[in-house]
Amino acid sequence: MNMSTNYSTTNQSYKHLSEAERGEIEAYLSVGLKPAEIARRLGRNRSTITREINRGSITQVKKVNGAKGLLPTLLCRCCSITVIRHAREASYYLKLDSVSDDFMRAFTDAMREKPRVHSVDTFVHTYRLQHVDAVVPSTKTLYNYIHQGLLEIKVIDLPRRVRIRKKFTKRPSTKKHLGKSIEERPEEINNRSRFGDWEIDSVLGGKTIGEPSILTLVERQTRYAVTKKLVEKKAEYVNQAVLECMKLYPIKSITADNGNEFSSLSKIEGLDVYFAHAYSSYERGTNENFNGLLREFIPKGCSLKELNQNLLEDYTKAINERPRRIHGYQSAKKLFELTQTA
């Protein structure tokens, strides 16, 4: 007997079930047809029909002849939802696989750099500009990866996420009268059209008596910051530091809160000083935002006694050199230097 074996090299193709086919499966099951017969009628493999039934079947409690019973029911919509969910789950890994090792290494190094220059958002934007042909995930996608534990970087490695804050308009009355109210501030300061208008604040470490403090000044238009370590949180040290800064930087006005350490600022000649309303830190939002960034390096409750001015300036420099989304991903330092020389 001449026996021969034929091996087919034809590529077999597989096509997912359509919504119409799933509806037909549900209808055929409702009239009692078996999977094999359904497969024959649809021109599908029996295993395909069986898998679809198993994936989309649910058990419902129904009354049959007045008695409760458990009936298996196929919901074609349920099958579709399952397929979509599996596809979405797989897409995370497909996206991650398309990202180069060079990007992931650079991202990990940037997030762990001390002092850190980039946020997740600014790193993504900068890397995309420098590597135009590379596959670069979006900021949102990277945050999703981090929260799902897919990356080496963890949530704890990110001290601050980008937040969108609601702007407040309520202005409570000022109880202290240390000088001119913020309500008297000219529009050119309010709309940031003029260069040289600053916001000022104090950053504390420990809460012990005699603990040093940090004076922070931020230029409103460019968000460029200057910091000074003070021996103590007192008006005399604040005024001394401000006078030193006025010799180095263009300071036309300062907006402060009602803290006692700022009570003598109005005595400085050639300087317009405005005071925000009590309990209204949002009126000095630029300075508050910088203080939050500085807390990455100097956590609350950490004593400032061992902190020296050089290290403080390194921290400030790192923040000033970060690309900022509000500046079209230019740094505050670059804008400050360009505006100062204009």
UniProtKB/Swiss-Prot annotation:
Q: What is one GO cellular-component annotation here?
A: cytosol
UniProt GO BP: DNA integration; DNA transposition
Q: Which UniProt keywords apply?
A: DNA recombination, DNA-binding, Transposable element, Transposition
Highest taxon listed in the record's lineage: Bacteria
State any single GO MF term.
transposase activity
Q: Where is the Integrase catalytic domain?
A: 182-342
Tell me any Pfam family this protein matches. Answer: HTH_38
Q: Which family does the record assign?
A: Belongs to the transposase IS30 family.
Tell me, in a sentence or two, what this protein's role is: Required for the transposition of the insertion element.
Instruction: Cite the PANTHER family for this sequence.
Output: TRANSPOSASE, TRANSPOSASE INSI FOR INSERTION SEQUENCE ELEMENT IS30A-RELATED
Protein's name according to its UniProt entry = Probable transposase for insertion-like sequence element IS1161
**What organism does this protein naturally occur in?**
Streptococcus salivarius
